[in-house]
């Protein structure tokens, strides 16, 4: 069994500036942490210098069980139906979200599990029934992430792209979709009639054992308005490299949108963690990954991001394709020593409206271990948790 380095790292705390929290931050001192599992090949680094691997159930099982051991609160998988190509064949190889998370629900016991529904591909009544099934498998630990779909070739290859006017109507579509879901989960029946869906005494039973959580990742005004009305929380991108609070205006917009509906909808922020013993060592990793950027795959991403001419400049895909840090789709990136990353995550927790983070790693298995043993014990916003060492195999 590997012993924890917590004692040595704790000696470093005094040298690292810490935040002063106010009394209202008691909830934030328990900031939620999730793992964005690598359902697609190579995770979230579009680089020939990054670890190259295929997505498998066994890999994701090991990741989520390790995350559960270190008291991560949730695991989320995306859905991707066509990749970016290039030398790395980035995201050309993907598992399916609901079936993967059903399997992971069966081999975990505490961690919350979220699958993503590509709503153009799955009727809401089928999603309602699949979700109720995974609720049964997990003992009430399951929820659904709803996405409208932005990458036209994913759907065009199957002949189900509804036309480019969908870009401007996609949240109208999603609004009807979630209303059908809520009917079926809440009452077991739906007679909803709308522009996109017509239910005729549609039935789903058994219903979920607990209220089913719905999450979304709206960053546009329309997306945030949807989340404010229907989601339990909203994902947003972190921004920049080692600028942990740069997303604050996005969280503020989400809070403002939620105030209009009288609901409490917090922001969960997406970050990549690249950590090492020292700041310099971590920075060297990051520079190495950037130097190997797969330009062909990145060109595909840029091309697809330009096809939505109906939405504004504030959509997720616009940020993903920004050339600044496109090598990891421009998610917020925290690069540094274990103590530095812990400090930056505490800064994330200080932002009003930030209720959690969704983390990716350059190397998931070792990254979760070092996070659990070297980073999390230094975080004020996770101080309620016990210090753990690596689990015995």
From Swiss-Prot:
Superkingdom of the source species: Bacteria
Binding site for FMN: 79-80, 145, 154, 170-171, 220
Keyword DNA damage: no
SUPFAM superfamilies: Bacterial luciferase-like
GO biological process: alkanesulfonate catabolic process; nitrogen utilization; uracil catabolic process
Root EC class: oxidoreductase
Database matches in InterPro entries: Luciferase-like_dom, Luciferase-like_sf, Pyrimidine_monooxygenase_RutA, SsuD_RutA_monooxygenase
Pfam families: Bac_luciferase (PF00296)
Reactions listed under catalytic activity: uracil + FMNH2 + NADH + O2 = (Z)-3-ureidoacrylate + FMN + NAD(+) + H2O + H(+); thymine + FMNH2 + NADH + O2 = (Z)-2-methylureidoacrylate + FMN + NAD(+) + H2O + H(+)
Keyword tags: Flavoprotein, FMN, Monooxygenase, NADP, Oxidoreductase
Induction comment from the UniProt entry of this chain: Up-regulated by the nitrogen regulatory protein C (NtrC also called GlnG) and repressed by RutR.
Keyword tRNA processing: no
Disulfide bonds: none
EC number: 1.14.99.46
GO molecular function: alkanesulfonate monooxygenase activity; uracil oxygenase activity
PANTHER family assigned to the protein according to its UniProt record, in alphabetical order: ALKANESULFONATE MONOOXYGENASE, ALKANESULFONATE MONOOXYGENASE-RELATED
Functional description taken from the UniProt entry: The FMN-N(5)-oxide reacts spontaneously with NADH to produce FMN. Requires the flavin reductase RutF to regenerate FMN in vivo.
HAMAP family in the record: RutA (MF_01699)
Family: Belongs to the NtaA/SnaA/DszA monooxygenase family. RutA subfamily.
Protein name (Swiss-Prot/TrEMBL): Pyrimidine monooxygenase RutA
Species assigned in the record: Escherichia coli O9:H4 (strain HS)
Name of the gene encoding the protein in the UniProt record: rutA
